[in-house]
Amino acid sequence: AWLEKYTIMEDCTYEDASEGTRQLSVYNLPDDTAAFGFDLPPVGSVARVVIDGRECELLHHASVTGAGLRLLVPIGDADAVLRYLEERAGLPVVGDEAFALWRIERLLPAVGAELGEETNPLESGAGGAVDFRKGCFIGQEVIARLDSYDKVQRRPCRAGGSPAGRGGR
């Protein structure tokens, strides 16, 4: 329901499919994706793919960590698809705690942690996800002004230790 307030003059409907769907995310997409066994659509596109005989919705996206994938999988197929990606494509599977450590080491913000409705994306480290060529999004004028005049007041920083490297493992 909260998406409706961000929808401006679009002819669309929303459906909560979370009961029967699981989302799998792939970060640090390797350059060679032939081992996946399916073709990736262009970045920014959604496609229906078959993974190990199971139909999935796939979003190929760009993010602050580089190219990535989001897979929507029927909940009954999720474990098999995850196993396939781990064994066939050689992708390591990590839990929530390991992922949180990975993103914090790289100063990557997350919704519910560093990002919320009151968060300025340029101050949170999510500026790379803002497209300044696109039209009309909520807060666009404020963000564009901060960017144009280089007036960002805060940025994530490392208090100690050495950088982990962008998208590294």
Regions found by a protein language model. Name each.
Residues 1-169:
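Basic, glycine/lysine-rich polyanion-binding surfaces/domains
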